[in-house]
């Protein structure tokens, strides 16, 4: 009944991944991002991650697997996803939704830390403001974006962009794979 739809969805996902893999710059960007994060951890820094909707879940997933574990038992790494509902509702109410992430970065971000901003469109105003706040704090910035990078294009030290212009779920599928690879590489870098 739905076999053709299932095949089409899986084929489109495979095609999106194949297109992402064609660009060697993506491979290099992932490696550079992992080394940047591991270097921050080794120097006493942390990563703060943020995003909206599914990207918010990805930001939490990234932090959870760094503080918890991925594939190997090892010490936890310093990672925070901006996901505190009290903070988000307070800042959203008092300052506006565009400031929910930047206000947190202002409060806990430090020079030597890294911000991971995730936005499938690259147009999330609250993530863009978090990038600005991170810059003011002397933090490094990594972005996971999609399409043409949107308003966030060119705003990061390292941008990992999925050049897919269809539905956001295809971009998210690559984002979660990139997140898992980042964690795997960080684990390798941390034992060097």
UniProtKB/Swiss-Prot annotation:
A Gene Ontology biological process term: D-glycero-D-manno-heptose 7-phosphate biosynthetic process
UniProt: substrate binding residues: 52-54, 65, 93-94, 119-121, 124, 172
Catalytic activity annotation: 2 D-sedoheptulose 7-phosphate = D-glycero-alpha-D-manno-heptose 7-phosphate + D-glycero-beta-D-manno-heptose 7-phosphate
CDD domains according to UniProt: SIS_GmhA
Co-factor remark: Binds 1 zinc ion per subunit.
Keywords of the record: Carbohydrate metabolism, Cytoplasm, Isomerase, Metal-binding, Zinc
Signal sequence region: none
Entry EC number(s): 5.3.1.28
Pathway involvement of the protein, from the record: Carbohydrate biosynthesis; D-glycero-D-manno-heptose 7-phosphate biosynthesis; D-glycero-alpha-D-manno-heptose 7-phosphate and D-glycero-beta-D-manno-heptose 7-phosphate from sedoheptulose 7-phosphate: step 1/1
InterPro entries: GmhA/DiaA, Phosphoheptose_Isoase, SIS_dom, SIS_dom_sf, SIS_GmhA/DiaA_subfam
The keyword Cell membrane belongs to this UniProt entry's keyword annotation: no
Function: Catalyzes the isomerization of sedoheptulose 7-phosphate in D-glycero-D-manno-heptose 7-phosphate.
Family stated for the protein in its record: Belongs to the SIS family. GmhA subfamily.
Alphabetized NCBIfam families for the sequence: gmhA (TIGR00441), PRK00414.1 (NF001628)
Note: The reaction produces a racemic mixture of D-glycero-alpha-D-manno-heptose 7-phosphate and D-glycero-beta-D-manno-heptose 7-phosphate.
UniProt name for this protein: Phosphoheptose isomerase
Organism: Enterobacter sp. (strain 638)
Upper taxonomic lineage: Bacteria, Pseudomonadati, Pseudomonadota, Gammaproteobacteria, Enterobacterales
